[in-house]
Amino acid sequence: MTTTTHSTAAIMSLLDEAEWRQTQMDVGGLIQASALGKVALRYAVRKLMKRGARLRHDSGLYVCICDPSYEFLQMNLSKISWLERHCPPLDQELIMFGVIEAWEEASVRPTRQLVLFMTPKWDVFAYDSGILFFLAPSMAQFWHGAIVLEYWNALFPVEVRSHVRQHAHTMDDLVMVFHQLDYEKQVLEARRDKNTEGPRTFAKSVNSYVRAILESERRIREGKIPMTFVDRDSLRANSLAHIQATGAQPSHAPAQRVLSAPPSLPLPVSEEDPAAAATPSSSAATTPPSSVVPASVESELSSSPPLPPVVVKDVVYTAGEGDVVQMVVVV
């Protein structure tokens, strides 16, 4: 009986090792094909799809390699082309190479599905619930990186940006977020290795990046796909409805000036630099006299009743004192 048990364990170990080697070869083939171009990548994906390949990610998730002809795909080609046009700063073609799925017992279709794309410039994205998430700047880094679906690496469609402020405005911003997440992931792994070999070490603090990585790992250990927006505070703080409900933004936050007034209009003196307001600039000294409002006209304007608000789509512009215009977003 003992001999049979040892033989079974040895066979299972050999099978696991063979599966691991085959996975590494398939992942290497995908990485090489992605470097050669989109035609080579599509050919490699179709070849693996015919084999029914399911490759294991370093996080523990299994990626089903497939193209848009996949039987259980929950989006069509028109949706993919729509994402290519409505999710700036993305301005490239999306090449599908796999999905990460969650199945319930006896379900006809997947209960949740992450669709994986790569662009001709090697950027890897995941699509979930109408939003694109930047995962890695290359195919090789994707297979060893963290699967995090947060506000910082999200690309919201332009139709949604009237309700939420985008964090990343360029692809460089997304790459910077990836490197920050990768750094925190390496620190966590090094701390775990040190804890197993020597005295126990503790983290100085747990920031939002670490919290998102730990929550993603916990969900994967439970056999689930990482959830979106673990850090709800960042998403809520950049919701335009929340900003309007909490009132005006503080004057010491220059990054939030766009939310208090349109960029084409002058800002109030209280929101500008106090030193600049106290010291007259050269441009102000050279202002022609015709641009100065006479005192009689100014008193006439101040005594006149306020103008009614003008509604333009979902933005209300209300005339205030002087030339200052306040923007109110209606959600």
Curated annotation (Swiss-Prot):
Give start-end positions of Low complexity composition bias. Answer: 275-304
As for subcellular location, the record says:
Host cytoplasm; Host nucleus
Q: What is its main location?
A: host cell
Q: Which domain of life is it from?
A: Viruses
| Gene Ontology biological process terms from the UniProt entry | symbiont-mediated perturbation of host apoptosis
Give me the ranges of the annotated region Disordered.
247-305
> Could you tell me the keywords of this UniProt record?
Host cytoplasm, Host nucleus, Host-virus interaction, Modulation of host cell apoptosis by virus
Q: Name one GO cellular component term.
A: host cell nucleus
User: Which InterPro entries does UniProt cross-reference here?
Assistant: US22-like
| SUBUNIT field | Interacts with host MDM2; this interaction leads to the stabilization of host TP53. Interacts with host TSC2; this interaction prevents host cell stress responses.
Q: Which family does it belong to?
A: Belongs to the beta-herpesvirinae UL38 protein family.
Q: What's its job?
A: Plays a role in the inhibition of host apoptosis to facilitate efficient viral replication. Promotes stabilization and inactivation of host TP53 through interaction with host MDM2. Induces host mTORC1 activation by antagonizing the ability of host TSC1/2 to negatively regulate mTORC1. Thus, inhibits a growth regulatory pathway to facilitate viral replication. Prevents premature cell host cell death by blocking host ubiquitin-specific protease 24/USP24-mediated autophagic ferritin degradation in lysosomes thus maintaining lysosome integrity and cellular viability.
The identity of this protein, by name, is Apoptosis inhibitor UL38
